[in-house]
Amino acid sequence: MDAALYFPRLLRAGAGGAAPVAVAASGAVAGVYVRTDVQRGVWRAPAGTDARVVGTVGPEVRLTDGQSGELNRQGINVIRALPGHGTVVWGSRTLRGADAMADEYKYVPVSRLALHLQDSITRGIRCTTFEQND
């Protein structure tokens, strides 16, 4: 329930003025998650125009609106270069988020909030593990 897929890879500047190099988006997307958590909370989607990907030249592949929509319907989140916003994460579906599936954990913020609550409750009641339960 807590996995998501992001496409395409990102381009980072090449060393010493060399051509840009394609790298996996996972590190940059993790950074967007952390920034979203700190600024807005785990219950907010790490996507949209506020979800800028910093430190990259841009996405390896430029997607059209139609291509982005089709990938999103399949549960694949896209990384897009939007005029006026830069490179952003555009989509917040889990791997259970394809339109063909009806799943309560279809979206990243729902899944992450459930995991956060589970962890918080577990930590909160740990001190009562060996208490009597009559």
Predicted regions and their residues:
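A glycine- and small-residue-enriched flexible loop/hinge signal that marks low-structured segments
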Residues: M1-D134
